[in-house]
Amino acid sequence: METLTAISRWLAKQHVVTWCVQQEGELWCANAFYLFDAQKVAFYILTEEKTRHAQMSGPQAAVAGTVNGQPKTVALIRGVQFKGEIRRLEGEESDLARQAYNRRFPVARMLSAPVWEIRLDEIKFTDNTLGFGKKMIWLRNSGTEQA
């Protein structure tokens, strides 16, 4: 669990995710503030259904994306690449996620956009602060962790 712990700790300090979806051969990416749930290994985001990325996602879709900082030197590069699934939350599941999201981002209380979950199935964390090109990999279904 050391790999997932290190990844989760870093993700908890960030706040913007980029994710990409595809539909019928067309790709589209979007950015949003996120809340990371370390227990579920998932991001929670708000986005309107009328957006291009939400329309392409439908109620559920495959997704890939990144979270990264903006360091000015290569030695400080840290970032996550991931793949998983995005889905729109409904009912109590949505309500609970929205409450947690609003605690992290109080301004979101004024938004009515639906809550979406990005469930991560594979994560690659690059952390050059541990040595140039240092990578850690986590896979949900196999429980595999690679350093």
UniProtKB/Swiss-Prot annotation:
Lineage, top-rank taxon, reads Bacteria
Signal sequence segment: none
UniProt family annotation: Belongs to the UPF0306 family.
Specify the protein name.
UPF0306 protein YhbP
- Species whose genome carries this gene: Escherichia coli O81 (strain ED1a)
